[in-house]
Regions:
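Short alpha-helical segments that sit at the start of domains
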Residues: 1-14, 36, 74, 80
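Nudix hydrolase/Nudix homology domain
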Residues: 5, 17-37, 187-237
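Conserved Nudix-box catalytic region and its N-terminal flanking loop in Nudix hydrolases
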Residues: 23, 35, 99-141, 145
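Short amphipathic alpha-helical interaction segments
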Residues: 33-49
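Acidic, metal-coordinating catalytic segment for phosphate/diphosphate chemistry
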Residues: 59-89, 166, 236
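N-terminal strand-loop-strand
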Residues: 76-119, 147, 177-180
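Unchanged
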Residues: 125-149, 156-212
Length: 237
């Protein structure tokens, strides 16, 4: 867990105090922060300026933004909890009429981390966005295709640093399936390369995400929840 960048530890303590009170006076916030009066005044002013705290007469209270932010606090440790990334993972399927094979739209990643690794397209869920909207947007942005998606389950993957044992990634992928789409495939995009490949071909691919087969199978079989942990070395990540 780590404190969110930009907030002083004293400001975190003030937010924590306000989390459990409808309003609080200056003396109560000073006691919670453990700082001298002038320093507390500075930090309260900063929180007001950031929009986390409102001043009501001689008292202070959390704003709507402040309530949402403070709700992420680990109240025992007094820090903002680090949370998994939420993203969609797109499994886009087609039947090739020439080869009579089932193919999947896959990407070669040309940016860090996982440079040159092959896998299914993914994308972060934006604030306030539905999963279907995210899947549709990501497909259009990265491939030029327009598709219709259905939700298939959750794939929770943690990545552990092989040398240190530290968890370096924690991701909640919403599995989204599509076999109805239109448009012309955009082969190159900023940070990657698109291609239709079969699962048989991917079995021979030396550089693919370690969870590739698991996540594809989870989506195709509509498994509600799949959780895995994989080790990656410095050279792989």
């Amino acid at each position: 867990m780590a404190r969110e960048a930009g907030l002083h530890s004293a400001q975190i303590k003030i937010l924590r105090e306000l989390l459990f009170m409808p309003t609080a006076r200056f003396a109560e916030l000073q006691k919670a922060s453990g700082l001298e009066s002038d320093h507390v005044k500075f930090h309260i002013k900063q929180l007001v300026k950031l929009g986390y705290v409102n001043k009501i007469g001689n008292a202070y209270q959390l704003s709507v933004t402040g309530k949402e932010y403070a709700n992420k606090l680990d109240t025992d440790a007094g820090v903002i909890e680090r949370q998994p990334k939420v993203a969609v993972l797109l499994v886009v399927e087609q039947h090739n009429p020439k080869t009579h094979m089932v193919e999947y739209l896959l990407q070669k990643r040309l940016k860090h981390p996982y440079f040159s690794f092959w896998g299914a397209p993914t994308g972060k869920v934006r604030w306030g966005e539905t999963l279907l909207d995210t899947a549709t947007r990501e497909l259009k942005e990265e491939t030029g295709l327009t598709g219709t998606f259905e939700y298939r389950g959750i794939y929770h993957e943690r990545v552990r640093h092989q040398e240190t044992g530290e968890i370096i990634e924690d991701k909640l992928f919403q599995l989204m399936f599509c076999d109805r789409f239109s448009g012309k495939l955009q082969v190159k995009f900023d940070g990657g390369h698109n291609a239709w490949r079969t699962l048989e071909d991917m079995m021979l691919e030396p550089k693919k995400y370690k969870g590739f087969e698991t996540e594809i199978a989870a989506c195709l079989n509509s498994i509600p929840l799949t959780e895995r942990i994989y080790n990656y070395s410095d050279s792989e990540f």
